[in-house]
């Protein structure tokens, strides 16, 4: 979900030769990004108001080069794990529109979502290209990671760190969703007890 569209606008400014589409269900949030893109006369940015589950209805097979997931709701409760935008349920949707070797970026302030995404990567044979548990502590930061969103500035998770992971999907994700859910019940419950 693109939220206020800061990432779409930022990437559009950095890469005027590429097209960017921000997707979110809430039109009032996207309006801010759309207005900013119009004000800056950025013709390579569009916004689509829809649910993420509907992506394959709007994009064809192999149509998307990259997907940026920036500061999504981490859905902290184990019972809501299937709503995490890096859950295999969503990764299978992304496979339908991503080009072969296309990449997915996750930038978050949630250590919980970052750990979950790494767990999913390990379990499902996903190729992690880059992973960082403190973006701004790096000596060199890729310019695409310097774009700040409204939600990043709020640091909702209170972690004072920004986590990043970039990965590409295999041709097929194994059917391990039940196994993942059972593992989450054990590990996330243990982490909650430890964190108290």
Predicted regions and their residues:
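S-adenosyl-L-methionine
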Residues: 35-61
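A short acidic, Gly/Pro-enriched loop at the edge of an enzyme's catalytic core
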Residues: 57-66, 71
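Class I SAM-dependent methyltransferase "Motif I" SAM/SAH-binding loop
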Residues: 1-4
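Conserved beta-strand signature within the Rossmann-like core of class I S-adenosyl-L-methionine
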Residues: 101-108
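A short glycine-rich, Lys/Arg-flanked "PGG" loop and its adjoining helix->strand segment in the class I
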Residues: 86-100
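SAM/dcSAM-binding transferase cores
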Residues: 129-196
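Conserved SAM/SAH-binding beta-strand->alpha-helix loop
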Residues: 26
